[in-house]
């Protein structure tokens, strides 16, 4: 099993190390793992952490869009640009080896990944995507806008309840 792990990253200078450690441990059974992260608008030392990881791990790469806030003031627009870059990376010919794409959060929510559960889920037939779950509100759903799936602003909906 070969995994390309991607994600967007901003202001995660410390959390990224724990995230990578967690993923390496949880996917120990993989034949191949490569990491690709897209950074923008960090105010901390995230870029230094990414540089350090890319020197330490041959399978770790990243790109930085620098300051997008001035060009794209809306957070979801910046996220979309960075996520689309991750998808472009997946589609590139150099990644034809990829069996599975894993999109991760890099802000410290990645903990205690159970490799047995991952293997079991992957072995199931008939799926195109699998998603993780967390306790409590999950902010990423806010970025999803679709006329059928999520036509409203989830935070506005929770305020009305």
Regions found by a protein language model. Give the residues of each.
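Hydrophobic targeting segments
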Residues: 2-7, 23, 34-37
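Short, well-formed alpha-helical segments that are part of the catalytic scaffolds
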Residues: 12-27
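A conserved acidic beta->alpha catalytic loop
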Residues: 13, 38-49, 67
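Alpha-helical elements of Rossmann-like donor-binding domains used by nucleotide-donor carbohydrate transfer enzymes
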Residues: 18, 22, 49, 81, ...
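Alpha-helix termini
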Residues: 25-30, 57, 89-98
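Conserved donor nucleotide-binding strand/loop of the catalytic core
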Residues: 51-85, 92-93
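Short beta-strand-to-loop acidic/aromatic patch adjacent to the donor-nucleotide binding site
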Residues: 95-109
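Conserved catalytic core of nucleotide-sugar-dependent glycosyltransferases
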Residues: 108-161
């Amino acid at each position: 099993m070969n995994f390309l792990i991607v994600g967007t990253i901003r202001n995660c200078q410390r959390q990224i190390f724990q995230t990578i450690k967690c993923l390496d441990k949880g996917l120990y059974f993989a034949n191949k793992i490569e990491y690709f992260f897209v950074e923008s608008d960090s105010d901390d030392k995230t870029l230094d952490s990414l540089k350090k990881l890319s020197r330490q791990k041959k399978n770790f790469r990243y790109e930085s869009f620098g300051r997008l806030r001035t060009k794209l003031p809306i957070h979801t627009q910046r996220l979309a640009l960075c996520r689309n870059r991750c998808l472009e990376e997946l589609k590139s010919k150099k990644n034809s080896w990829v069996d599975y794409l894993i999109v991760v959060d890099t802000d410290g929510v990645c903990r205690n990944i159970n490799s047995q559960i991952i293997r079991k889920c992957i072995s199931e037939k008939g799926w195109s995507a699998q998603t993780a779950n967390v306790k409590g509100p999950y902010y990423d759903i806010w970025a999803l806008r679709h006329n059928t799936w999520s036509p409203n602003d989830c935070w506005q909906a929770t305020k009305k309840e």
